[in-house]
Amino acid sequence: MLKNSLSGIAVMFACCAISMQPATSAQGPEVVRKVLMQHDLPMPGWSEALVSVEIPVGGREGRHTHPGPLLVYVTEGAITLDYEGQPSKTYKTGDTFYVEADKIHEGINMGNVPARALASFVTPKGQPLTTQAK
């Protein structure tokens, strides 16, 4: 049961890790994010969030980080992940990926249909889900 609870929490935090601010016009079409659920975890000092994300064709999130781990499940389309220190990788419908805390990354939709995902964020309480990279 604890394992399931921790998995659920990790999923929630990953969602929060996704930037909650829309992409700027310089980054292409606007990325849409919606917090579906957010609450404190039973672990002192931590909270979690589950976020739906839609990246339109040609859209990009902008380079950013999260203060905690992020788990992402791609529900439609494909997301190309540019991840600090690694080659870009494309994740398609049904794929999952993990982003470490404080690692600069960016999700990009290079496909011909909108990309949608569920992201779970686990973050220190009171911290923003996402911080744009400098």
Give the role of each language-model region.
Residues C15-A23:
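C-terminal segment of classical bacterial N-terminal signal peptides
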Residues I55-P56, G85-D102:
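Short acidic-glycine-tyrosine-enriched beta hairpin
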